[in-house]
Amino acid sequence: MNEFKKYATRHIGLNAQALDDYTRIQSSYISPTIIEERQLNVAQMDVFSRLMMDRIIFLGTQIDDYTANVIQAQLLYLDSADPGKDISIYLNSPGGSVYAGYGIYDTMQYIGCDVATICTGMAASMASVLLVAGTKGKRFALPHSRVMIHQPLGGMQGQASDLEIAAREILRVKKELYTIISSHSGKPVEQVEKDSDRDYWMTAPEALEYGMIDKILEKNRK
């Protein structure tokens, strides 16, 4: 984790405060520490850091700027460390900020590594976009997972001209999101738009049929 922190702050320019805030978010979970015996010493680390050593990123929170910054840094670091090896993102998230999610999405598409996505509970709203954006053939869900797509939410107060600007932007975002889901799932944009008019919940088999995932994982055979 120390190597990642050095990379994130020195080479990517990620604010150290953002890393600390993300650590506090993670510590709000029951986050056990791992004692790992090595050849010369014994190392203690939180379980999320240990997972990252195996190229596993866990997104188990609402998507906000702090979370997105760290996940983008993790993706870039792992791509730099070994460009030919897959990265896995486990998703259990209700979604969150579209703009923060865009940062994660674009980074997933930018890096050279294949990115496997695995839904382990719920991938809703922006998290469903990240799920479907995984590398084709490497998008998975556990049997009782739920996937939900819907139109973006927004609201603001201000002058009439400001409201018009905000309305145009949310319509542009809606079109972008539907296009992304369509391009990765194979569903026509018109179908995605119709289904997303209200919360559209899918079971794992329904998500498979829709093209959001490629396979339902029953058992880890490793």
Curated annotation (Swiss-Prot):
Q: Where is the active site?
A: 125 (nucleophile), 150
Gene Ontology MF, one: serine-type endopeptidase activity
A Pfam family matched in the record: CLP_protease
Q: Which Gene3D superfamilies match?
A: 2-enoyl-CoA Hydratase, Chain A, domain 1
Q: Name one GO cellular component term.
A: endopeptidase Clp complex
Any keyword Protease? yes
* InterPro entries to which the protein is assigned, alphabetical: ClpP, ClpP/crotonase-like_dom_sf, ClpP/TepA, ClpP_His_AS
Its top-level enzyme class, in one word, is hydrolase
Q: Which GO terms describe its biological process?
A: protein quality control for misfolded or incompletely synthesized proteins
Keywords (alphabetical) are: Cytoplasm, Hydrolase, Protease, Serine protease
Q: Which reactions does this protein catalyse?
A: Hydrolysis of proteins to small peptides in the presence of ATP and magnesium. alpha-casein is the usual test substrate. In the absence of ATP, only oligopeptides shorter than five residues are hydrolyzed (such as succinyl-Leu-Tyr-|-NHMec, and Leu-Tyr-Leu-|-Tyr-Trp, in which cleavage of the -Tyr-|-Leu- and -Tyr-|-Trp bonds also occurs)
What does the record give as EC number?
Answer: 3.4.21.92
Tell me the compartments it is located in: Cytoplasm
The protein's assembly and partners = Fourteen ClpP subunits assemble into 2 heptameric rings which stack back to back to give a disk-like structure with a central cavity, resembling the structure of eukaryotic proteasomes.
Q: What does this protein do?
A: Cleaves peptides in various proteins in a process that requires ATP hydrolysis. Has a chymotrypsin-like activity. Plays a major role in the degradation of misfolded proteins.
Q: Which family is annotated?
A: Belongs to the peptidase S14 family.
Q: What NCBIfam families does the record point to?
A: PRK00277.1, PRK12553.1, PRK14514.1
> What is this protein's name?
ATP-dependent Clp protease proteolytic subunit
Origin species: Porphyromonas gingivalis (strain ATCC BAA-308 / W83)
